[in-house]
Amino acid sequence: MATTDVISQEVIRARLDGIVREMQAAVLRTGFSTIIRESHDFSAGITDREGNVVGQFSPLPPHLGAYPECVKGVLQFYTYDQMSDGDCFLINHPYYSGCPHPNDMVVVLPVFHQGKVVAFCASMGHKSDIGGQSPGSRNTLARDVFGEGLQIMPVKFLSERIPHKETHQLLRSNSRTPELVIGDLGAQAGALWSIGAYRLKKLMDEYGQDSVTDAFEQIGLRTEARVRQVIAEWKDGVYEAFGYTDDIVDPNKKLRLHVSAIVNGDRLTLDFSQTDPQSLGPINARPPFTKGMAYYAAIAMIDPGIPNNFGLARAVDCVFNEGTVLNPTFPTPVGFYSMTLSTVEDIIFEAISKAAGKPLVAHNASSGMVVMGTVGGGRRYVQYELMMSGNGAYDGGDGWTGTGHSWGGGSKLTSVEILESEFDVELRNFSLVSDSGGAGEYRGGLALRREYVIQQPSRYAGGSPRNLSPAQGVGGGLDGIAGSVTINPGSTDEQKYVGIISNIMLEEGDVVRVETGSAGGAGDPLNRDRLRVINDLRNGYISPQSAVATYGLSEEQATQALSPKPEVI
């Protein structure tokens, strides 16, 4: 029986969301690395004492599925009696937490009130380097997680707010950029205890511990009820979707990802059991992030205003077969999981769209990445960037450019000024790739291009996935294009790579051109509004040849569209 009235529940829920936002703002402002303060590859959340999410407002929705497993990972090794007020725990092991790969480290802080653990605050953030063969710990040659850098089961990062000496020594000796790793972790831990725990304690002082913990349960039940109410309106049945991700071990092999959205009354089950067996290479993805993606898709289809909390997990089930790409067995590598997760997002949305009877959305582009680290005796750094590409088109609108897959839409491109001021590179080109967006009545988001001039010997890792299976169009729309990495383009020693690569040696003066993939289009290109075609042509989004051959514009119209307007005297 609820002891907190509905109005108080909603006030407490809003306060929890505010606390999460404030924690995230603190991490952003105090983080050391560009991956935190520029790319925004981090989040924060609040769980109850069992690890059920009660507050999360993340720019990266899959993190919703990660925090329960991270807290449970800590509880697997530490009892409540072994915790003290001000302790912070650190974990990154993909098979003992919700962390998708070792680069993502989570800080977990138990919140004490009246002498007992009442909740946990947690923050996940990508780390620039945690050791391993390649700078940035991005290694396509990894055949187990031990080749992907430092693996940490739960350990103390702070003991009663005092840095844990042994943990800090461990981190310093296993990173090319220890000051960034420890600095970012300090930002996360500081946000949790100085804002998260402090605000939660004040909330419980104000409303009472029992009322707040009761509200934790009630706001989850309300989310569950709302989701079930809408699912019950859908037609019972099985709705399937599939897509592909490229294997890293065999670049000519596609791995099939499959989902069945099963609607049964007010219950939705997403069954991924027909997905291909796991790869030997680091393209596999552990279940927690896929679950988070499922919850995010359900919210998007039902009501974007639904609070993110454990009620989603009670209304949406996920089923996996062990030993598949989406549920690999220990110690299978998972370092490039995000390249697979972009396809997972596409097929989940396709299946749920069918179940909900809503128009399909073209597949999103898979965002690329740039990781460059110095070698030899020069200034030591690891340059880590996310290259956010384009969204898929939908019936009624073009896909956005420069946002990447929707689940990473809260991440951002690092500015040219920051890159050139902090790393030994010069940006020679930053532009959109003409004719890249999947053609259609509604065009897919375009690919991005960046060219870097290297100013000291370095090693490169990154690229774009889905070379064999670019983002799919829908309803007659065309597919997007694949991405590529070209070393010294246009020169006699030009080298072009597709897919994901690592450990590519670069010399001073080399030029690296990175082009991301692009998103699919929706509808027949010949049905695209003529004014939209002309505007795309004038903006350089499409070429005159494409305007004529693909969109049906006459050569005269194309020429006229690009003719300079007469000056008005």
Task: Pin down the residues of each PLM region.
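Glycine/proline-enriched, intrinsically flexible loops and inter-domain linkers
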Residues: 1-85, 90-113, 117-569
